[in-house]
């Protein structure tokens, strides 16, 4: 098996530029002359990383415009990346990249040619983690993981892909994570493949919560794996990650040691912080009312930082929902006769209160949309997360919805709308911070069927919420969204698209 690639250090802009000059055997003075700079002092400040982000950005743009070094695309990308490292630091850069991965903007590079190697202690045989998980899923009735650390996306992706519903092997994951510094963002991104599952339970351990010896246990990358064979036989394994892509599987493991370790972890749980809290309810009509009411309470009076593909239903006056709701409820047989009208009336009351909260509260709402998804809504009347029991919005309703959002964007200082820049990939995860309560992660492009593919989870871990807000304000709003004037122009374009649509 191939060795895992050695990660390259993150360079500041000055360091990256020095590297390029060394590669081309150029001096700083020579580059300054090639760029026709009036003062050579500025380039030395850039190289020493003492000139500040704005000056470095201006220098980078001037360098690209002059094309005096004939930079390759790879070199341009490296310089662009180093600008971000200089702006937010190496830890902040990693944190932002993890958040982009969470949104689905930055894909993890495939590492299929460097598989996780698993060495078995019993016979010295070798396999891959992927093969080991697939075999476990085939040969067992149930598998229970108790994990510390192991926060690598490839590990959880492999587990999620092996234990599919088709395998009929019940799985559960109890996960303990040490979450100091910026680790929390990377960890949530890493566990995303299993994060929404009700069978995943995560606990965060804050810095200095335990003594050094106890802390080392939670910092270790280990798995205790309890298997129940199809014939009822029980067996347990202990797995340790001993290299970046190499695991040691101890079989059979010492059952007494494992039992004592799990008992200790269970007793420590009150001093930990639960990673998530789900609010989804079982699918019956009454539960949808409770579900909607839960969101109303979550939104009420809070500052909100939201990443959505297109317009949320809570931004639409319920008068504009009635036609779509009545038609859809009838087609889907969502309630009957008088019961249906009573249900619609209750939904109307809750949504009116939600709508009025967003339009009148004196705490800011910030929402970033995907232009592509909003254009699809303008043309078809179908939201990316359109409720399965609602019909599409009619043309005139769409025009009114979009015109109202445009007016709020221009006139309401507490209601701030944005669009991602064209070069930013549309997110595949919707994330919303309800300040003071938690951050909601929602799978995009579902039909809100709580008995189907729709799922969300509320992360109440305070460090994650703080880091997401910093990312939203200092990264997304600073460099990834259109200006206010450009946003208004996009709304004008959307309104015209709705007016001229055939549907």
Feature roles, as predicted:
Residues 32-34, 58, 142-147:
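Short coil/turn segments at secondary-structure boundaries
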Residues 1-28, 33:
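A short, Lys/Arg-rich alpha-helix, primarily the initiator
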Residues 120-481, 489:
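Hydrophobic protein-protein interaction segments
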Residues 21, 46-47, 59:
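DNA major-groove recognition helix of helix-turn-helix
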Residues 1-10, 55-115:
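Short amphipathic recognition helices of helix-turn-helix/homeodomain-type DNA-binding modules
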Residues 36-55, 81-82:
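Recognition helix of helix-turn-helix/homeodomain-like DNA-binding domains
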Residues 481-503:
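Long, C-terminal catalytic modules of enzymes
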């Amino acid at each position: 098996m191939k060795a895992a690639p050695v990660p390259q250090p993150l360079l500041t802009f000055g360091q990256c530029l020095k590297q390029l000059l060394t590669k081309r055997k150029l001096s700083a003075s020579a580059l300054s002359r090639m760029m026709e700079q009036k003062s050579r002092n500025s380039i030395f400040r850039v190289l020493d990383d003492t000139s500040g982000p704005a000056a470095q950005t201006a220098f980078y743009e001037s360098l690209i415009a002059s094309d005096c070094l004939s930079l390759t695309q790879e070199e341009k990308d490296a310089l662009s990346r180093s600008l971000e490292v200089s702006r937010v630091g190496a830890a902040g850069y990693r944190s932002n990249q993890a958040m982009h991965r969470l949104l689905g903007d930055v894909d993890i590079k495939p590492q299929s040619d460097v598989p996780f190697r698993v060495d078995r202690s019993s016979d010295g045989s070798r396999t891959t983690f992927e093969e080991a998980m697939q075999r476990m899923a085939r040969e067992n009735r149930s598998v229970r993981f108790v994990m510390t650390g192991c926060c690598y996306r490839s590990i959880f992706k492999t587990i999620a892909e092996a234990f599919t519903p088709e395998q009929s092997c019940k799985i559960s994951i109890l996960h303990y994570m040490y979450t100091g510094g910026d680790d929390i963002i990377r960890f949530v991104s890493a566990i995303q493949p299993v994060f929404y599952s009700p069978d995943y339970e995560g606990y965060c351990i804050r810095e200095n919560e335990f003594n050094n010896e106890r802390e080392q246990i939670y910092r270790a990358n280990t798995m205790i794996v309890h298997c129940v064979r199809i014939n009822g036989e029980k067996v347990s394994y202990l797995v340790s990650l001993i290299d970046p892509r190499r695991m040691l599987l101890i079989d059979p493991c010492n059952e007494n040691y494992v039992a004592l370790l799990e008992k200790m972890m269970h007793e420590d749980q009150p001093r930990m912080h639960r990673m998530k809290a789900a609010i989804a309810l079982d699918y019956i009509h009454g539960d949808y009312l409770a579900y909607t009411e839960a969101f109303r309470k979550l939104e009420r009076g809070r500052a909100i930082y939201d990443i959505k593909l297109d317009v949320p239903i809570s931004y639409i006056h319920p008068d504009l929902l009635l036609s779509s709701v009545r038609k859809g409820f009838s087609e889907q047989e969502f309630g009957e006769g008088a019961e249906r009208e009573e249900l619609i009336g209750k939904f109307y009351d809750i949504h009116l209160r939600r709508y009025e909260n967003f339009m009148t509260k004196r705490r800011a709402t910030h929402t970033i949309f995907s232009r592509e998804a909003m254009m699809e809504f303008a043309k078809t009347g179908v939201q990316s997360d359109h409720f399965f029991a609602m019909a599409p919005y009619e043309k005139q309703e769409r025009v009114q919805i979009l015109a109202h959002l445009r007016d709020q964007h221009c006139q309401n200082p507490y209601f701030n709308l944005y669009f991602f820049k064209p070069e930013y990939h549309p997110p595949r995860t919707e994330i919303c911070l309800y300040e003071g309560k938690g951050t909601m992660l929602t799978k995009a492009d579902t039909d809100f069927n709580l008995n189907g593919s729709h799922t969300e989870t509320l992360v109440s871990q305070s460090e994650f919420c703080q880091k997401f807000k910093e990312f939203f304000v200092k990264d997304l709003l600073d460099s990834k969204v259109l200006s206010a004037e450009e946003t208004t122009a996009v709304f004008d374009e959307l309104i015209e698209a709705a007016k001229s649509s055939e549907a």
